[in-house]
């Protein structure tokens, strides 16, 4: 009887060991590689009552952006490389490496768009309009080298980033000088995230040291705020300002997003303050935009918690 007990015990242990081994094999992460890409086409007829602008805003067609890239996932790791081709030249777009601690928390490192407000959460192919609002163009940053922590919880979304200036991707420091740096954060509260019943409010904040300028006299002593007209056919500034004698830039941006059934609305406000040196008056600027959207065909808007915003409409929808 004792011998039988030992045999049963040994057999049970062996089966448990085998089951554990098979479970480990099942849990072994797999490398998944996916190609990515898109083509952006634009056509337009433009007119301005300002004669100078009218001479610059010419009619035409363009293929201003062709993207090709690859993304790879392996367990808790995800990598992305995206290359753009525009106007007969290649440029690096997103180059990032993510580590997912769990379903709600990750850290991203590399060259990418850091979250600051509604427009920063997704790429241009997922936005309401093909081009971003002018206020966002003027006060937001493009892709930056840095690291970003993201918490995408059930009711609360938060990010925190540190970064170097955009020109760090274009020049070595012997030409660029000491790189400008900064930090930013985005905080969102989302009590309603059901289909056709969405509401969130949030606020973003950022600090930046003075940026590079090709004019050596004001390089890393100034900021340039620029917003082009919303077209890729012509690159014409709607607004532009260079603020010299600068010491630091602070900005904040409250946001709101809601949807009821097939109706959606989003709005964002920007405030920028620049502290200046040499007894120059400090510079302040503000801007805002709002977008209204409606599904002519569809079952109501949905919410994406990873990006904190209204998701791209379902396949087969008409917006």
Label for each model-derived stretch:
Residues 180-284:
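Surface-exposed beta-loop-beta
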Residues 54, 285:
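Flexible, glycine- and charge-enriched loops at secondary-structure boundaries
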Residues 26-48, 56-168, 174-211, 289-315, ...:
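Outer membrane beta-barrel
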Residues 50-53, 128-133, 234-241, 275:
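Extracytoplasmic loops and strand-loop junctions of Gram-negative outer membrane beta-barrel proteins
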């Amino acid at each position: 009887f004792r011998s039988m007990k030992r045999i049963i015990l040994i057999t049970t242990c062996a089966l448990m060991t085998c089951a554990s081994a098979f479970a480990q094999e099942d849990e072994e992460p797999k490398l998944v590689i996916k190609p990515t890409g898109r083509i952006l086409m634009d056509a337009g007829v433009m007119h301005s009552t300002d004669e100078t602008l009218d001479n610059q805003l010419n009619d035409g067609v363009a293929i201003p952006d062709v993207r090709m890239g690859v993304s790879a996932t392996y367990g808790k790791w995800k990598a992305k490389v995206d290359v753009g081709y525009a106007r007969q030249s290649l440029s690096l777009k997103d180059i990032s490496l993510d580590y997912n601690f769990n379903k709600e928390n990750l850290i991203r490192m590399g060259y990418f768009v850091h979250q600051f407000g509604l427009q920063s959460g997704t790429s241009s192919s997922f936005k309401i309009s093909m081009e971003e609002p002018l206020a966002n163009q003027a006060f937001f940053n493009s892709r930056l080298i840095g690291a970003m922590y993201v918490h995408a919880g059930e009711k609360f979304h938060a990010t925190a980033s540190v970064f170097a200036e955009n020109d760090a991707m274009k020049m070595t420091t012997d030409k660029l000088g000491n790189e400008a740096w900064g930090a930013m954060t985005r905080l969102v509260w989302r009590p309603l995230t059901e289909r056709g019943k969405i509401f969130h409010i949030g606020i973003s904040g950022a600090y930046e040291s003075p940026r590079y300028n090709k004019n050596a006299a004001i390089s890393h002593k100034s900021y340039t705020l620029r917003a082009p007209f919303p077209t890729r056919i012509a690159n014409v500034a709607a607004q532009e300002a260079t603020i010299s004698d600068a010491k630091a830039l602070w900005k904040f941006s409250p946001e709101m997003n809601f949807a009821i059934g097939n109706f959606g609305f989003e709005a964002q406000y920007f405030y920028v303050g620049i502290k200046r040196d040499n007894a120059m008056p400090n510079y302040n600027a503000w801007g805002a935009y709002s977008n209204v959207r409606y599904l002519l065909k569809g079952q109501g808007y949905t919410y994406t918690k990873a990006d904190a915003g209204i998701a791209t409409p379902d396949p087969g929808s008409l917006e």
